[in-house]
Amino acid sequence: MKALSFLFIPVLGLLVCGQSLCPIDKAISEKIQEVTTSLVPGAVRIIGLDCRSVTSRGSLVTCPSGFAVTGCTCGSACGSWDVRAETTCHCQCAGMDWTGARCCRLHIQ
């Protein structure tokens, strides 16, 4: 009988807290929300994304210093490309006439 009552307690807890948060979980969630609401918008406001497009003749193009590749494009209807060292786009088709890259960096305003 004692074993049965010990099994009943966790089940009762699940029934009480099943769909909604328990009071302690709700209090913790509210506190986390309160703290992050005041911190995150302030941090996000001062961080910006600076992006630019660069092109070059041939099969390689490199982003300016401090920028990283976010996408590549190739001439001659070539759709095969790869990113090298996070800063250079390489078009893999033979006889490339041009290669382009979209380069971005985070900056603090």
Swiss-Prot record:
GO molecular function, one term: hormone activity
Keyword Signal: yes
Disulfide bonds: 51-104, 63-103, 72-89, 74-91, 78-93
Keywords associated with the record: Diabetes mellitus, Disulfide bond, Hormone, Obesity, Secreted, Signal
A Pfam family assignment: Resistin
Keyword Secreted among UniProt keywords: yes
Compartment(s) of residence: Secreted
Highest taxon listed in the record's lineage: Eukaryota
A GO cellular-component term linked to this record: extracellular space
Signal peptide segment: 1-18
Biological process annotations from GO: positive regulation of lipid catabolic process
Function: Hormone that seems to suppress insulin ability to stimulate glucose uptake into adipose cells. Potentially links obesity to diabetes.
Family affiliation: Belongs to the resistin/FIZZ family.
Self-association and partners: Homodimer; disulfide-linked.
Stated name of the protein: Resistin
Organism of derivation: Bos taurus (Bovine)
Gene it is expressed from: RETN
